[in-house]
């Protein structure tokens, strides 16, 4: 690896602004994800993360009854139904996705693509385990209309990523020591079996890998949902610049570029699915959810078995399609990203989130969480 040590702040900002102008739109609909097996978690239960980035910043939770299983899912707000952007069912099957940009190998038109949400909605209603999901993929009509990475855990100890395009899929078994020798696997917006050096999210992948390796491998730490939220979804470490805004008070004294951190202006939710050990009651499966911009949100645990009794502030209200929690977070977020004209939306007030006085929004909300 080659790292560039940039000491001149003006030089950093000039370079970053140039990059930002050239960033393609689909970087805004990218996600960061990870699977942690019981080998590296505090209670031995698997954890599945999806940190969502999207053009639709309003999200809410809904409960659905599928052909076989009921399930909780993250959906856009408003939503016309039939689409889930992650979820968990009452059989202990949980699924997430990240978009991939190096798997498509055909000329299927864009009008037939972007059906990942439909695929997950259908899978949550009929799948109990990884075997069911693989059969489900095999029996879908082609082209499937997807180009993505699907992370799945089940109640039988299964944990895997599936790299899927219109015609085929490839499995990365996170329990396989050759695939995940350290008990975890991190996925952003490229597929490991896809075209080399294409796709997106390489810096976010390095950011996350750095934080996880330091904690799990160097410190011998064990992971739980709170650690994931604090050190992935709310981390402002940048692996290319080798800066961590939460630790460097000089860099973090005011404004900064919103580029290639895991949490970005386009971040709309963060979910950690806490599975069960083989043989445990599947009703112990928990869906930890932050709606809105994760550095400003509060993680709320929801039990799938109690899915029809979701906290009222996480679902649409009588007066709005939006969840009250998400609305409150997005209102606060306006102060962090206040500039709308020109390239102003590429900058954010980091010191409104974290500061040395301890009065940042994120610092105050941590006590609530």
Residues of each region from the PLM?
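Hydrophobic, Leu/Ile/Phe/Ala-enriched alpha-helical segments that form helix-helix packing faces
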Residues: 1, 20, 137-141, 275, ...
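Bacterial Sec-dependent N-terminal signal peptides
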Residues: 1-30
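Short, basic/low-complexity N-terminal boundary segments at the transition from targeting/disordered tails
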Residues: 13, 22, 60-68, 123-135
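C-terminal, well-structured catalytic/ligand-binding subdomain of enzymes
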Residues: 32-81, 86-87, 94-122, 154-369
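Short, charge-rich binding segments
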Residues: 86-88, 142-143
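Intrinsically disordered, low-complexity linker/loop segments enriched in Gly/Pro
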Residues: 116-148
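An amphipathic, aromatic/His-enriched active-site/gating alpha helix that lines ligand/cofactor pockets
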Residues: 151
């Amino acid at each position: 690896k080659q790292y560039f040590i940039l000491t001149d702040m003006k030089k950093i900002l000039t370079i970053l602004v140039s990059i930002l102008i050239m960033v393609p739109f689909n970087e805004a609909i990218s996600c960061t994800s990870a699977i942690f097996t019981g080998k590296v978690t505090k209670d031995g239960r698997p954890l599945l993360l999806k940190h969502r980035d999207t053009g639709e910043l309003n999200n809410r939770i809904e409960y659905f009854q599928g052909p076989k299983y009921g399930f909780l899912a993250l959906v856009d707000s408003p939503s016309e139904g039939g689409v889930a952007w992650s979820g968990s069912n009452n059989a202990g099957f949980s699924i997430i996705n990240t978009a991939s940009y190096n798997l498509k190998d055909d000329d299927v038109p864009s009008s037939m693509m972007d059906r990942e949400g439909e695929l997950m909605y259908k899978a949550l209603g009929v799948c109990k385990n990884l075997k069911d999901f693989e059969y489900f993929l095999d029996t879908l009509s082609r082209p499937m209309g997807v180009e993505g990475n699907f992370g799945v855990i089940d109640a039988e100890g299964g944990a895997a990523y599936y790299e899927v395009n219109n015609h085929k899929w490839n499995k990365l078994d996170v329990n396989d020591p050759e695939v995940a020798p350290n008990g975890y696997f991190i996925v952003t917006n490229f597929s490991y079996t896809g075209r080399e050096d294409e796709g997106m999210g390489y810096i976010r992948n390095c950011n996350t890998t750095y934080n996880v390796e330091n904690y799990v491998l160097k410190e011998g730490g064990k992971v739980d949902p709170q650690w994931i939220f604090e050190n992935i979804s709310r981390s402002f470490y940048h692996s290319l610049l080798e800066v961590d805004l939460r630790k460097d008070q000089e860099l973090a004294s005011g404004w900064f570029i919103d580029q290639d951190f895991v949490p970005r202006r386009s971040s709309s939710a963060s979910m950690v699915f806490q599975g069960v050990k083989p043989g445990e009651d599947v009703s112990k499966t928990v869906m930890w959810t932050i709606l809105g911009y994760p550095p400003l949100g509060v993680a709320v645990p929801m039990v799938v078995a109690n899915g029809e009794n979701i906290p009222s502030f996480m679902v649409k209200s009588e007066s709005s399609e939006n969840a009250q929690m998400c609305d409150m977070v997005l209102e606060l977020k306006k102060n962090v990203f206040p500039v709308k004209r020109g390239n102003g939306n590429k900058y954010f007030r980091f010191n409104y989130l974290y500061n040395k006085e301890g009065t940042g929004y994120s610092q105050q909300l941590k006590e609530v969480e």
